[in-house]
Amino acid sequence: MKMNLKRLVVTFFSCITFLLKFTIAAAEPPEGFPEPLNPTNFKEELSKGLHIIDFYSPYCPHCKHLAPVWMETWEEFKEESKTLNITFSQVNCIESADLCGDENIEYFPEIRLYNPSGYIKSFTETPRTKESLIAFARRESMDPNNLDTDLDSAKSESQYLEGFDFLELIAGKATRPHLVSFWPTKDMKNSDDSLEFKNCDKCHEFQRTWKIISRQLAVDDINTGHVNCESNPTICEELGFGDLVKITNHRADREPKVALVLPNKTSNNLFDYPNGYSAKSDGYVDFARRTFTNSKFPNITEGELEKKANRDIDFLQERGRVTNNDIHLVFSYDPETVVIEDFDILEYLIEPLSKIPNIYLHQIDKNLINLSRNLFGRMYEKINYDASQTQKVFNKEYFTMNTVTQLPTFFMFKDGDPISYVFPGYSTTEMRNIDAIMDWVKKYSNPLVTEVDSSNLKKLISFQTKSYSDLAIQLISSTDHKHIKGSNKLIKNLLLASWEYEHIRMENNFEEINERRARKADGIKKIKEKKAPANKIVDKMREEIPHMDQKKLLLGYLDISKEKNFFRKYGITGEYKIGDVIIIDKSNNYYYNKDNFGNSLTSNNPQLLREAFVSLNIPSKALYSSKLKGRLINSPFHNVLSFLDIIHGNGMPGYLIVIVLFIAILKGPSIYRRYKVRKHYRAKRNAVGILGNMEKKKNQD
């Protein structure tokens, strides 16, 4: 028996191995599939645009598994590649060993992005799928830096720093800020030098990124420098960069590190870049610019804040990133009553604010309540666009209730947003509590509308779930001028619907607070009638009524020209087009793509979109009784079995409950029959017989 089982197992695995070999061998190239590049045509082909190149060995198992994926990717993308001017190519490193040696290829397969000047970055996503490769191609084809030939021929502005030079910086002797990179080498005098980095595959691509950073920051009078950690082990180890001094784990890849040194300061002047490694320059540049600007606590005027809040933002632009989607944290004080100690809190905010993108710190010597009230009134001008409907009224009492504070305090304004926020600083205690202030800042730290992609969806879903119930995603496209213009209009409609919903949400909050007040007053009245002790009455009167600020919306837009496989990746089923809106319930990961009438959810009709928000979060205020039907993200079930989503959403406990119920239904009748038989049997055994119950007779004597 054991021998037969062993033979079966061996036969099974032999079949699997054969099938795998057959599958790999059967991967025939599609018609027109290009031959691998070689030393003769490599540079000529690179001169024609962007190239994603697979450096492979025909004897490498991983390369063999990648081969059919690469062919499918090329075939599906070949027409789009002509439009985007980016090509999928290959190099056989057995036939072109010298070429692979010149390109420092250390393992197979290695997938790299090249432009006419040479290597830009590596593709490091796993698993390597057709979808991830195509998404990478689309993303990189739209990055203007990748085709900037002037940049590639230019030199880096970064200065080589000896250990003594860096110590001078942190001693406060610099007059300009320095963004400094740290490298696992001792030989890099110029950051453009061609070097071999051990266990640092990302170092080569970051050299180009660092050049971009150095040139962009030079415009802002921010210096850049680089430190060789192998030459300065003590400094790097003290900074927590010990892995750049020597290899501690040969299997782990190392990454360059970056830190900012502020000038003319001997303390609180060194800040590590907080967001981890990236081959993109934007995050580093924003970090350096904002942190340096924030460290100066610049003044701002009411007029400047009003202009920023009233700004009409185009979230999509034909060139470059959106530059006016910022958040402004303003320290507001009365010059007649402020004391020098009140300003100390600003120094403690520099470091935590450096970790939040797009947030700027300012100060102003006046109360901004009137500005906040006036801006809030502008929101009602926007949402009262339909004269045929009942005009919505600004609830001044609710506004006052949510802006009670004393000076000094903090206000927060967002570009393009008429809604501002006031920190509840009722006393000096709150205004000197850095944790309380940062908790409040983080709660409102998302920009007005955020670009959603595969890298940040999960982060947005988990962001402040107690306050923000839903994430609304507008689908747009940035393929050309016409689409960009139309997409900006769609995002503005999304904003309009969200402001209408915000009015209803605030009115509902106000009603709930008044109900709690009435219940509290009724409770006080009752205990007074019962002639309760004075201390109990006082305790009841001191009970605080919580002002719950929940069921808010997070807004985002998804560029489907960049993220065509986004829906498949996250298991969001259905056919989608530009203009559609997807609402994700952040509490249970359900998504909704139909309105109250079963039609595709879009922002073309802001009122229907508003009603979708209301139906999900405040059904008692909804105009329509019909409920929205949602699906679970990454549900394993077909639409026909969507009722099973609730089981899958509860994970293992959900399936265990179903199994228990199934067993109960299956075994229930037989268990019940056995129970009846046993009960009947016990009843027969307890029969008294012809002599009667002897114990009873004894009791009768």
Swiss-Prot record:
Protein name: ER-retained PMA1-suppressing protein 1
Signal peptide: 1-27
Keywords annotated in UniProt: Chaperone, Disulfide bond, Endoplasmic reticulum, Glycoprotein, Isomerase, Membrane, Redox-active center, Repeat, Signal, Transmembrane, Transmembrane helix
Subunit architecture: Interacts with mutated PMA1-D378N but not wild type PMA1. Interacts with EUG1, KAR2, MPD1 and PDI1.
PANTHER family, A to Z: PROTEIN DISULFIDE-ISOMERASE C17H9.14C-RELATED, THIOREDOXIN DOMAIN-CONTAINING PROTEIN 5
E.C. number(s) listed in UniProt: 5.3.4.1
All residue ranges annotated as the Thioredoxin domain in the record: 28-142, 408-446
Reaction(s) catalysed by this chain's protein: Catalyzes the rearrangement of -S-S- bonds in proteins
Chief place of localization: endoplasmic reticulum
Transmembrane segments: 646-666
Keyword Endoplasmic reticulum: yes
GO-annotated cellular components: endoplasmic reticulum; endoplasmic reticulum membrane
EC class of the enzyme, as a word: isomerase
